[in-house]
Each structure stands twice: as structure tokens, then as C-alpha cells.
Swiss-Prot record:
Keywords: Amino-acid biosynthesis, Aromatic amino acid biosynthesis, ATP-binding, Cytoplasm, Kinase, Magnesium, Metal-binding, Nucleotide-binding, Transferase
Recorded GO MF terms: ATP binding; magnesium ion binding; shikimate kinase activity
Subcellular location: Cytoplasm
Protein name: Shikimate kinase
GO biological process: amino acid biosynthetic process; aromatic amino acid family biosynthetic process; chorismate biosynthetic process
EC number: 2.7.1.71
Length: 187
């Protein structure tokens, strides 16, 4: 069953999901959870360790099981991992159970936000070396091109490039509340 007050935040790493998510949840009076953190708690180890020790298939299965558990919740904001929508089963589950919000940012802004992060595999070369900002921006563009068709299927799209955090939270709160009211009225 679809719960329109179950809000899934998607977007590229650096789009603001983890920063804005808790503030948005507070503004809406909802609970906040980070999907990756929930997976780590369930597995008892970090996502990097899950990938290294168990492989991507095991991680994707944990991701799906965690989403299935979350899918029955209401009044919750869930920050999704960057690649979750690439998994067809996860994508369909999210679309079927909640409201998907795409936090859209340009490759230029994302590369600026991510340039000092050292824990992101996408920011490293094949031998673990740090990439230049231009290389990071190019890599982000390539990944976004692949993910964009799924991102565009979101119920709401919010551009997070040049806004202050507070105004982004206000805009998202307004749009989500309006969306929930409209969908509930039309049901």
C-alpha cells in the first residue's frame, strides 16, 4: 500500500540528502532514517565491508530487505543511497510504497561539494588515487547520465544547487505537504 507520507529522498552523493533529510523530517514532524545506516546496523558492519566481504549482490539484497521493512511506515523521511534506484526491485518498491523526491544538483556543484570527501570510491582513480576536480566532475556527469531516467520518474524534483539549506527545507516542506494533500484528495 502506498503511504504518501513515506518520503524517499534520492539524488547523487552530495545533493544534500543527509544534511537536509533530518531538517526536512523535523519540519514535517516526521522521523528520519538513512537507508545506508540502517543497512549497516542490520549487517553489523560498514557498507564498504559488506561490499568487500560479501559482494554487491549481498548488499543489494540487504538494501531490498531493509526497504521492504521501511515500506510499511508512515510519516518518515528516508535518505536513499546513490545507486538504490538502479535496482529494479528497489525502484518499484519505492514507487509503490511512498513519495519519491529527487534532490537535483549539477555536476559542477556536486564536484565542489564532494572534492574534500575521502570516503567516496567514485572520487578515486583505479589505483585509489585522488582525482582532479575536472575528473570528478566528468565521472559525476557519466553516472548522472545513467541514473537520470530513474531520477526523472520522481514524484517531486527539487533543485538544490544554489539555495541555502533553510530555503531548500522550506521549499521541500511546502511541495511535499501540497503533494500529500493533492494525492489524498484525489484518492
Amino acid at each position: 500500500m502506498k503511504h504518501h507520507s513515506l518520503i524517499f529522498l534520492t539524488g547523487f552523493s552530495g545533493s544534500g540528502k543527509s544534511t537536509i533529510g533530518p531538517l526536512l523530517a523535523n519540519s514535517l514532524g516526521f522521523e528520519f532514517i538513512d537507508l545506508d545506516r540502517e543497512i549497516e546496523l542490520a549487517a553489523g558492519k560498514s557498507i564498504n565491508r559488506i561490499f568487500a566481504e560479501d559482494g554487491e549482490a549481498a548488499f543489494r539484497e540487504l538494501e531490498l530487505r531493509t526497504l521492504e521493512r521501511i515500506g510499511s511506515q508512515k510519516e518518515m523521511v528516508v535518505s536513499l543511497g546513490g545507486g538504490v534506484l538502479e535496482n529494479d526491485r528497489c525502484f518499484e518498491l519505492i514507487r509503490r510504497t511512498g513519495t519519491l523526491v529527487y534532490m537535483k544538483s549539477s555536476p559542477e556543484i556536486l564536484s565542489l561539494r564532494l572534492q574534500h570527501k575521502t570516503d567516496r570510491p567514485l572520487l578515486k582513480g583505479p589505483n585509489g588515487e585522488k582525482l582532479s576536480r575536472e575528473q570528478v566532475e566528468q565521472r559525476i556527469s557519466e553516472i548522472l547520465e545513467k541514473r537520470e531516467p530513474r531520477y526523472q520518474k520522481a514524484d517531486l524534483i527539487i533543485v538544490t544547487d544554489s539555495k541555502k539549506i533553510g530555503s531548500t527545507v522550506e521549499e521541500m516542506t511546502r511541495k511535499i505537504e501540497r503533494h500529500i494533500r493533492r494525492v489524498e484528495r484525489d484518492s
